[in-house]
C-alpha cells in the first residue's frame, strides 16, 4: 500500500465542461490513453460514462473522477486529477460542486456547432468558482468544422487571445499531448494547506452493495489518514475511515491523503443521503470551525406520479426506487394512491431529463413497467385564512373558495439560436407565457435570447418544440429565479359525472378552455365505446367548460320484428332504454392506459 504524500506543486486538478455531445467523454478517453492509465486494447468508448444509459444517450449523469500520471516535456512527473462533470442543466448543482474541487477547467466547444447555451451556463459557473479556463475547440478534423468562426465566438465570449485557444480532435487523438502540456503550464497547482484542520469537499458518492456509500472528495485543507474518525457537517454524523485512496481505473488504497489530493473515502455509510454532494468532511477529534462554502440542499423541481402497470408490482416498484435512491440522493419519493391508478409513488426530480432517466432505469435495470402521470411543478397556495400550502399534485389543490392566490415557480431561460429562427422562437415563447427580456448577438448569425418563463410551461415538451421550430439549431439553459403570483385554475376531467383524479391538471386560466377542449377530444378518440353513452367533461370547480360524448353501442332489438304492431316495437325500444339507464348507473368506464399517456402528448394532434 503506497502513501500518497505527493508534493502539491505536481498536482493538477481540472475538469472538462461542455454542452452535451461536444466530445467531453471522448476527450477524457484520449487523456487516459495518452497517460497510459488505459491501454488502447482495454478501451471501451467513454470509459468514465459507466452506466449503459450514459453511453447510449451520450450524456454524463453522475460526476466521475480519475487520477492519471503524466511525464511532461521537462521530464517532471505530474499527477492529473480529472473530474468529469455532467453537462446537462438538470445536474448543474453537481457541476458546481465538481468545479469547486478543481483549480482549472477545459471549456470544450464543438467546431461544427459553436458555443451553445449550456457551454455559457457552465462557463459562468467556472468563472464564479474562480477557475483558470482553457478554451478548447474539438472535432477540428470534421469536414463541416468552422474553427475560425468558433474561435471568434470564444474570443467574444471570454475575451481571450486567439493564441490561447487550443485545437484538438478527441476522436482522432490530434492535439491531445499539446493540451496536456497546456494543462500543466496554465492550470495552477493547489495551495499547500496541509497544516490546517481537515476540510474535504464531497463532490460525488456512489453506493456499493458490500462497502456502503463510497464518497468521492477533494481535500482542501489538512490531512486525512486511514483509521481517522471523520465527521460530516450536514448531519453531524461520525464515521471511521476504513479505507481511503485515489482513483485510477480502479480504486487504489493509500494511507494518507493531503490538501490538493482528490480521492475516495469508505466508512461503512449505509445511506448515500448521509454523504451529500457539497458537504464538508472534517476530523471528529480536531474539527474545522466552519464548513466550505457553497453547500445547499438540492430541491426537486418537477414532480410526477409513477404507478405500476400491474397493481401487484407495487412492492417491486418500491424496492426499485429504494435501490435507485441509494445511488441518487436527489430522487425524492413518497407513496400515494389514486382512485384511477391504484397505489404508486409521487416522485420529485431535478428536471425533465432526470425524470426520463429515472423512468428508463426503472424499466431497463429493474424490469418494472410503469405509468407516468403528467409532470407538475410545486405550487404555493395562499389560503383565505393566510396559511400557505405547497401543492405538487393537482388532486391535492384546495377548493377555489378557500384560495386567496396561487404562486408558481419561474425560471430565467437563455436560448442560443441562429438569427433566422428568432421569429419562430418568439412565437413559441409567447404561447408558453414567456416574458422576453433582451437579446445578445454572439456573432453575425447567432443570438442569445433571454426570457423568463413559468417553470410549468417549459417542464413539459418545450425542449422538443424548441428543436423543431429552430430545425435543431437552438439550445437552451434555465435557472430558477423564485415564485410569482399567477392566475391558475385546477381543471378536472369527469367521466359520466365522476372525477378522474389522475387526469386533473393545473393550468393558467387563459389556457383552460383550449386545454379542456383538446383533452376531451383526445379522450374521446381513445376511450372505447361502451354499451351506454359516456359523457367526457372538462370542468373548473362546478363549471363545465368543454364536453364530448361517446355514443353508445346498441344492438338492433327490432331485428326479429317483421312488420307487426308499432307498439310492440316501442315496447322493445323502451325496455332497451331502461336497461341502458340502469347500466349507466352501475357501470364504470374502463379507462385504458393510453388515456393517461394521451395527456402527456397533447400536442401531437
From Swiss-Prot:
* A Gene Ontology cellular-component term: plasma membrane
Q: Which residues form a coiled coil?
A: none
For the keyword Cell wall biogenesis/degradation, the answer is no
Q: Which GO terms describe its molecular function?
A: GTP binding; GTPase activity; ribosome binding; translation elongation factor activity
Residues that bind GTP: 21-26, 138-141
Q: How does it sit in the membrane?
A: Peripheral membrane protein
Q: Does the keyword Mitochondrion belong to this entry? A: no
Keywords per UniProt = Cell inner membrane, Cell membrane, GTP-binding, Hydrolase, Membrane, Nucleotide-binding, Protein biosynthesis
Recorded hits in Pfam families, A to Z, give:
EFG_C (PF00679), GTP_EFTU (PF00009), GTP_EFTU_D2 (PF03144), LepA_C (PF06421)
The subcellular localization recorded is: Cell inner membrane
Q: Which residues form the signal peptide?
A: none
Domain tr-type G residues, every copy: 9-191
Name the predominant localization.
membrane
EC no. given is 3.6.5.n1
Reactions catalysed according to its record: GTP + H2O = GDP + phosphate + H(+)
The organism's superkingdom is given as Bacteria
Q: Name one GO biological process term.
A: positive regulation of translation
Matches recorded under HAMAP family = LepA (MF_00071)
Query: Of which family is this protein a member?
Result: Belongs to the TRAFAC class translation factor GTPase superfamily. Classic translation factor GTPase family. LepA subfamily.
Q: What the protein does?
A: Required for accurate and efficient protein synthesis under certain stress conditions. May act as a fidelity factor of the translation reaction, by catalyzing a one-codon backward translocation of tRNAs on improperly translocated ribosomes. Back-translocation proceeds from a post-translocation (POST) complex to a pre-translocation (PRE) complex, thus giving elongation factor G a second chance to translocate the tRNAs correctly. Binds to ribosomes in a GTP-dependent manner.
Query: What is the protein name given in its UniProt record?
Result: Elongation factor 4
Q: Lineage from the top down? A: Bacteria, Pseudomonadati, Chlorobiota, Chlorobiia, Chlorobiales
Amino acid at each position: 500500500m503506497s502513501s500518497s504524500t505527493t508534493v502539491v506543486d505536481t498536482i493538477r486538478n481540472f475538469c472538462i465542461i461542455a454542452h452535451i455531445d461536444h466530445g467531453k467523454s471522448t476527450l477524457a478517453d484520449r487523456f487516459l490513453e495518452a497517460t497510459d492509465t488505459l491501454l488502447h486494447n482495454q478501451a471501451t468508448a467513454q470509459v468514465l460514462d459507466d452506466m449503459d444509459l450514459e453511453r447510449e444517450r451520450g450524456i454524463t449523469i453522475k460526476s466521475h473522477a480519475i487520477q492519471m500520471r503524466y511525464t511532461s516535456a521537462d521530464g517532471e512527473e505530474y499527477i492529473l486529477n480529472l473530474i468529469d462533470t455532467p453537462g446537462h442543466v438538470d445536474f448543474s448543482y453537481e457541476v458546481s460542486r465538481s468545479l469547486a474541487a478543481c483549480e482549472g477547467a477545459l471549456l470544450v466547444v464543438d467546431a461544427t456547432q459553436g458555443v451553445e447555451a449550456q457551454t455559457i451556463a457552465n462557463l459562468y459557473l467556472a468563472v464564479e468558482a474562480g477557475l483558470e479556463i482553457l478554451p478548447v475547440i474539438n472535432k477540428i478534423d470534421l469536414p463541416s468544422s468552422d474553427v475560425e468562426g468558433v474561435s471568434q465566438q470564444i474570443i467574444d465570449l471570454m475575451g481571450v487571445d486567439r493564441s490561447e485557444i487550443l485545437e484538438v480532435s478527441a476522436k482522432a487523438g490530434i492535439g491531445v499531448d499539446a493540451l496536456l502540456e497546456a494543462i500543466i503550464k496554465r492550470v495552477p497547482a493547489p495551495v499547500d494547506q496541509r497544516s490546517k484542520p481537515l476540510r474535504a469537499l464531497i463532490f460525488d458518492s456512489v453506493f456499493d452493495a458490500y462497502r456502503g456509500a463510497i464518497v468521492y472528495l477533494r481535500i482542501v485543507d489538512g490531512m486525512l489518514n486511514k483509521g481517522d474518525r471523520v465527521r460530516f457537517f450536514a448531519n453531524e454524523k461520525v464515521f471511521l475511515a476504513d479505507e481511503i485512496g485515489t482513483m485510477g481505473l480502479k480504486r487504489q488504497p493509500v494511507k494518507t491523503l493531503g490538501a490538493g489530493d482528490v480521492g475516495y473515502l469508505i466508512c461503512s455509510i449505509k445511506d448515500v443521503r448521509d454523504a451529500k454532494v457539497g458537504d464538508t468532511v472534517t476530523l471528529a477529534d480536531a474539527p474545522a470551525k466552519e464548513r466550505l462554502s457553497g453547500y445547499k440542499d438540492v430541491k426537486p423541481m418537477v414532480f410526477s406520479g409513477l404507478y405500476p402497470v400491474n397493481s401487484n408490482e407495487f412492492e417491486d416498484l418500491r424496492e426499485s426506487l429504494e435501490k435507485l435512491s441509494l445511488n441518487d440522493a436527489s430522487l425524492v419519493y413518497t407513496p400515494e394512491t389514486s382512485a384511477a391508478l391504484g397505489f404508486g409513488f409521487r416522485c420529485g426530480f431535478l428536471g425533465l431529463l432526470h425524470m426520463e432517466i429515472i423512468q428508463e432505469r426503472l424499466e431497463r435495470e429493474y424490469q418494472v413497467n410503469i405509468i407516468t402521470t403528467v409532470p407538475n411543478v410545486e405550487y404555493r397556495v395562499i389560503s383565505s385564512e393566510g396559511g400557505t400550502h405547497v401543492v405538487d399534485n393537482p388532486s391535492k389543490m384546495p377548493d377555489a373558495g378557500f384560495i386567496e392566490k396561487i404562486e408558481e415557480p419561474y425560471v430565467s431561460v437563455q436560448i442560443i439560436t441562429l438569427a433566422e429562427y428568432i421569429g419562430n422562437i418568439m412565437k413559441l415563447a409567447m404561447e408558453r407565457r414567456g416574458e422576453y427580456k433582451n437579446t445578445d448577438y454572439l456573432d453575425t448569425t447567432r443570438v442569445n435570447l433571454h426570457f423568463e418563463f413559468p417553470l410549468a410551461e417549459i417542464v413539459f415538451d418545450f425542449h422538443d418544440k424548441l428543436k423543431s421550430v429552430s430545425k435543431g439549431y437552438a439550445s437552451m439553459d434555465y435557472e430558477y429565479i423564485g415564485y410569482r403570483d399567477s392566475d391558475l385554475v385546477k381543471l378536472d376531467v369527469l367521466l359520466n359525472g365522476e372525477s378522474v383524479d389522475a387526469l386533473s391538471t393545473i393550468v393558467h386560466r387563459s389556457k383552460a378552455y383550449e386545454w379542456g377542449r383538446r383533452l376531451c377530444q383526445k379522450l374521446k378518440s381513445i376511450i372505447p365505446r361502451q354499451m351506454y353513452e359516456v359523457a367526457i367533461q372538462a370542468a373548473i370547480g362546478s363549471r363545465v367548460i368543454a364536453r364530448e360524448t361517446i355514443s353508445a353501442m346498441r344492438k338492433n332489438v327490432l331485428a326479429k320484428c317483421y312488420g307487426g304492431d308499432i307498439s310492440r316495437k316501442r315496447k322493445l325500444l323502451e325496455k332497451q332504454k331502461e336497461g341502458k339507464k340502469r347500466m349507466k348507473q352501475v357501470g364504470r368506464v374502463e379507462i385504458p392506459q393510453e388515456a393517461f399517456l394521451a395527456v402527456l402528448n397533447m400536442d401531437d394532434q
